Amino acid sequence: MPKSVDSLFLARTMNRFNPIVLVGLLLSPVLFLALAGRTDGNRPHVLFIAIDDLRPELGCYGSPIAKSPNLDKLAGEGMRFDRAYCQQSICSPSRASLMTGARPDQIGVIENTAYFRELNPDVVTLPQHFIKHGYEAVYCGKIYHARMTDDHHSWSRKPAYDRCPKMKWLPGNYALKENQELWASNKEKMLAKYGKAGSGGLIHGPAYEAADVEDHVYGDGFSTRLAIATLEDHLERKPSQPLFLALGFKKPHLDFVAPKKYWDLYDRDEIELASQTKSPKGGAATGLHASFELRTRHGIPKSGPIGPDLAKTLLHGYYACVSYVDAQIGMMLEALDKAGIREDTVIVVWGDHGWHLGEMGIWGKATNYEIATRVPLIVWTPGMKARGQSTHALVELIDLYPTLCELADLPRPNHLAGKSFVPLLDEPKSKWKKHALSQFPNPALREWAANPLSPGMRQTFFGPLIKEVEGKIIRQQGKSWDRDLFENHLMGYSLRTEGHRLVAWMDYRDLDAQPVFLELYDQKADPDETTNVASGNPGKTDALLRQLKRELARAPPRPAK
């Protein structure tokens, strides 16, 4: 806010109060933080909120069930992006792509186990770029994938742990003793049976929990407390320095764990199961997984369908987690208002990818379809003209890096693959991108972290399920079946246009070769992507394939080592 506004505010205060009262006001913490929030150079603060595994399942996106009043209000005061897409529908690649401003192929991060900094030691990340231009940058919660937090480069300080009560460690991240014991027992069994290497990803307890505890007992509530304390600490210590504050929520990622009061917001009888539970007719057998991530949880069938009662409980848990996170965001926004810096802050809320909640017969992320690649994106800026509106423009998460640079009046790094969507904040109906590009390596024959099947995975309880999925692919491919290609080198590239989605399954070592399989979905006639119409529309399929290859040529995969 301009200094003249502060001067006017003080002048009015002088006229209304005597000097003794005025001194008391100036010494009050709220007013101190309000005045402290003015930054040098009028550069805005940035509140950068990431939500794990959240698809656009919010009231503001038309969900008839989800209770998300705080995000709904933010969208009503900012801008809602109705067609925003991630670059890969799994945690580490999606987040690394957004934070570096490059596509997964460009940085070589196509699985959770790949660390972008090891592969790209000189890349300048989004918060790193802000630090270079005078910002303080700090994160609370999950921004990058676990153990790949890039602390040395991306962040200039640690959160204010000294101002926040410590969080009690929860075994397995469960609050209920019986669930902690189930987790510990499962851990012991998996380690004994498969060893440390073979049990990776298999050690879990129940898929859900509804403990009657305070919000901060679980991680997301603690992260919110910590972020608020860090905000206050920064405004006291460095009042004139702009702050890039990243707050990352781990829910509604499995396990669906949230305080009981958020479960109580929902009437179980009103929760509807997915209506489209079949795989796409004529679709790629390699395009869907067998819900591996969910099936590692205690009490979930290791094969076969998820029954309706269990499915409803899982949906209930997902919605409870959505409301839990929404409440935390409400507290964070209230802290901005209390500090008096809301009008000096750019707010961005994004989900890293979508999630199948029974759609197409599976549970989880990790596909190239609409339900997994489309994400929620809400932006609020102090000076936006199209307040309270939405846009149908196609945008991608890699567009956030250049957008925030423009909003903060920072130079744009040369390596960015995205496009600033600042013009949409003024005119949401502007002509925009013709497509959004996502990718995912063979979901059917990869582990749930997108990494190739480990040597021992076929020997676990997933062995029969892997064999079943593999059999479907072999039957579809016939003589073209190549185990090494399908397990290690097959990439699905998904091009989303105004009216269609093309999914081209290709050997990413040779993008000039003929695709192994092609899928085409008519988004206007078939928004649920129930039927692959590629064979009946060769002209449209070929045109979109050429368009896809042109885009891939601009950002080719890193050479395989």
List each language-model region with its residue ranges.
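Formylglycine-dependent sulfatase
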Residues: 35-501, 509-513, 531-550
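Bacterial N-terminal signal peptides
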Residues: 21-32
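Positively charged n-region of N-terminal signal peptides that target proteins for export
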Residues: 2-3, 12-19
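Intrinsically disordered, low-complexity polar regions and short flexible loop motifs
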Residues: 526
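Short hydrophobic beta-strand that contains or immediately precedes a catalytic carboxylate
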Residues: 520-521
